Structure formats: structure tokens, C-alpha cells
Amino acid sequence: MKLHTLVSCLHDFPVVPKENPEITSIEADSRKVKEGSLFVCMKGYTVDSHDFAKQAAAQGAAAIVAERPIDVDVPVVLVKNTFRSLAVLADYFYGQPTHKLHLIGITGTNGKTTTSHIMDEIMRAHGHKTGLIGTINMKIGDETFEVKNTTPDALTLQQTFSKMVEQGVDSTVMEVSSHALDLGRVHGCDYDVAVFTNLTQDHLDYHKTMEEYKHAKGLLFAQLGNSYNHNREKYAVLNSDDNVTEEYMRSTAATVVTYGIDTTSDIMAKNIVMTSGGTTFTLVTPYESVNVTMKLIGKFNVYNVLAATAAGLVSGVKLETIIAVIKDLAGVPGRFEVVDGGQNYTVIVDYAHTPDSLENVLKTAKQFAKGDVYCIVGCGGDRDRTKRPIMASVATKYATHAIYTSDNPRSEDPAAILDDMVHGASGKNYEMIIDRKEAIHHAIAKAKADDIIIIAGKGHETYQIIGKEVHHFDDREVAKEAITGRLNNEE
């Protein structure tokens, strides 16, 4: 593709050189540049790839996209924002693949992963070959890949969509992070359905204020409907019980469908009953009301199911198909996942890493707990410090015993993170154990019959970041090891 043809998709008045070389690939990593590449420079948090433009040119780059003039011997296209330009260029270069997909985007603080997995199952049951992009993994049909970010970088994203189309995928569900929206990674993505789960405190190390965080999430809905395929109706699926929904309603040009429990909505759940074995409720839709029994536990999972149900219905899936999927749902790795080693107490691993998600998990555990509730929780280093005392407060409020421990301390002193947390502790029902493995073993050693242990924060993650080192660490493995060790000692 010729350079002038490619950059014609940019609408922010780029400064385009006279030269018009052939472009054979797009790269954002100078180490991957080869003959014919278009190298896009981006200023990140720690590295500014404008500094590698000469290296890219030396490796054969045919042209460079930058935010400032660069002294190189190849054509330079100047744009205002290279992050957003990369997304639009990649979409155009790969043939605008999302035009050929039914694309469902899910955003919100909590519930994105579970909702996306439920939605993937619903679309499969409807006969689609599906794609899935999310926190845990990426799927193309039945093939699974590891991921680094909730939402991949723009180039990887469009390459993935292109691969999905090539392999016959016709419906894709993806988690859309606030970072991806703010940085413009999803510019060029033609969403058919956008789903909002909820908005609670998180990522304030990046967004600084809740107002900025709310605005970033809202971009998915503000941009929905202002897109390419005007012959396809767009839908915004919004949680009526969240107080930002009215603002998102006003910002979108799409058709709005609501779901909720406490507020009158298009899709509702009533008569909710929870036990340790699952949840039953009445699913109320504009078409009919149906009694539903599912294995998933917790009010938060009812919200996830309602969101997926609404998205499924606007995607043309029959209600009976959706109900059948809900009844068979087995859960998502690291989301209220029970670790069973034959013990007489319950151990649950959950990704809860925000005050709201931790409160939801602990409230759910208390609803069916016959004994004490333990909560093992930490807060990430180099991340939002303001939520540390709040997390600690939630743990001591809802758990019988709270254990504060490490959770990816990164460059910070783990003891200092725990000190920040302790400021929010109410009461004396907590202890601090810096070593996460020791904390898990300690709780499991103390647990009595019918107690519940919640190991919060990591969920599906299999690593612990200490300094710049990434160590293997899986809460589920450590818990199973501790359970087995205790059982062996008791024999």
C-alpha cells in the first residue's frame, strides 16, 4: 500500500511529505522494523520511541509517523497524536476487519472478564465462530493465546481482528480498559454493542480523579454510533443501578438497553436467592419472565449475567438459548474459584482488587458462611495509594479475620504498602504477613470446619512482581499445597 493511500485515513490534518513509498508493514517497536515498514513513534511513560527513529530508518523503514520533526533520510508524516494515529492506520492497513465482525465491547471497573466469557458462550451457542479478547486470555475459535494487557496495543489488536476474519470468526467479544480508551488504542474498532458493568474506584494512579476515570470509560459510548457501518444498529447496554449510567445515556447516539436489580430496567433480576451451591432468580425481560438457576454465586454474578443477557438479546440470540447457557455456566478462572483439596473448610481465590469488588466477594461469602471468614488481601506497588486504606477497611469490616500481605509490590517496600493499608483498618481483627505464601499457609493452618478463606487480588494471575523481577506465583497452587500439607499432617 502506498504511503499517501494509507495516511488518507487520518483525519487530524496530518502533515504529509511529497514522497510516496510503498508500505509493507506497520511497526511501533523499532526492533521489528524491516525494509518497507512504516514506523510509528510514540512517547510512553518511560520510553520515547521518537529517539529510535534513526535506528528504524537505518533498518529499512520506508517512512516514519511522528509528533515532532525528526532528522532522518526517509519521509516523515507529522500528526498530533501518534497513539490514536497508530490505531486508525492499523485498522486501515489490515482492511478494517471489525467491519466484518459483530463486535461487542465490555467496559467497567468490575465484571468485565466474567461478562465477556458468558457472552462468548452465548454467541457460540447461537452458532457463531467466536473471538475473545480479555484479561485472562485471547481466543480465536478454540485456539487460546496468552495476553499482556486487558486490551492489547492498537497494532496487535487490528492484527488479531484480521487473523480472526481470516479464520472465519464472525463474532468477537472484548474487554475494553479505560487505559485503552484514553490512549486511543481502540480507535478504528467498529463496535456493534457496548456494555457497561459498573464504575468504582480503580486506576487513579493513571487517571488521577474519578471524574477522569468516568470520562475515559464513557468514551466507548460517546463514540458508539458515530462509526462506519450506519446500516447496522448500535446498542449501548447500561447498568441502571450505577449512578453514571444517565450520563452515558446522554452521551451516546446508540439505542440504549438497560439492565438492573434495584432500578426498573429493560432486563431485571428479581427474587434472588443465594446458597453455597449457586443462585436462583427470576429473569424479567420485555418478552417473558423466567426462573433461572445457575452455579455462579453472588449478586455481582447476577449483574454479569444480566449484562450478558441484554447484550445477547440485542445481538439476535433467542432467550431460550441464553437461559440454557446460564444454567450450564461453570465460572471463570480466578473469579470466586473454589480450591478443593478435600478439606472441611472453603478456600476461594478471587481477582477482587478494588474496594467494591472486595466488598462484593466478602458480602457473598458471609451470606452462606457457617463459620468465620478470613480475607487475605494486598495492594499493588506503584499503583493507586489512595485505595490501600479503603481495601483494608473493607477487609476488617466484612471478614472475621483480615490478613494484609504482598500483591505485586514492584519497586515499593512491601512493609510500607502494608503500613498504608493499616491506616484504614477498623478494629483489631487483622494481622500483617508480608510474605504472601506464608499468609496463605497461615490462614489455612488456622481455619476450622465450615470457615471460608478468601484469597483476594490475583485471581487467575500466575506471578508476583518484586522489584523488576517477575516470579511465578499462583494463589491456587499455593492454597492447594497448604491444604494438602495440613491434611497430611492431620493423618
Curated annotation (Swiss-Prot):
Pathway: Cell wall biogenesis; peptidoglycan biosynthesis. Carboxylation is probably crucial for Mg(2+) binding and, consequently, for the gamma-phosphate positioning of ATP. Keywords: ATP-binding, Cell cycle, Cell division, Cell shape, Cell wall biogenesis/degradation, Cytoplasm, Ligase, Magnesium, Nucleotide-binding, Peptidoglycan synthesis. GO terms for cellular component: cytoplasm. Its EC number is 6.3.2.13. UDP-N-acetyl-alpha-D-muramoyl-L-alanyl-D-glutamate binds at residues 30, 149-151, 177, 185. One of its GO terms (biological process) is regulation of cell shape. It catalyses: UDP-N-acetyl-alpha-D-muramoyl-L-alanyl-D-glutamate + meso-2,6-diaminopimelate + ATP = UDP-N-acetyl-alpha-D-muramoyl-L-alanyl-gamma-D-glutamyl-meso-2,6-diaminopimelate + ADP + phosphate + H(+). Optimum pH is 8.5. PANTHER family: MUR LIGASE FAMILY MEMBER, UDP-N-ACETYLMURAMOYL-L-ALANYL-D-GLUTAMATE--2,6-DIAMINOPIMELATE LIGASE MURE HOMOLOG, CHLOROPLASTIC. Catalyzes the addition of meso-diaminopimelic acid to the nucleotide precursor UDP-N-acetylmuramoyl-L-alanyl-D-glutamate (UMAG) in the biosynthesis of bacterial cell-wall peptidoglycan. This is UDP-N-acetylmuramoyl-L-alanyl-D-glutamate--2,6-diaminopimelate ligase. The lineage of its organism: Bacteria, Bacillati, Bacillota, Bacilli, Bacillales.
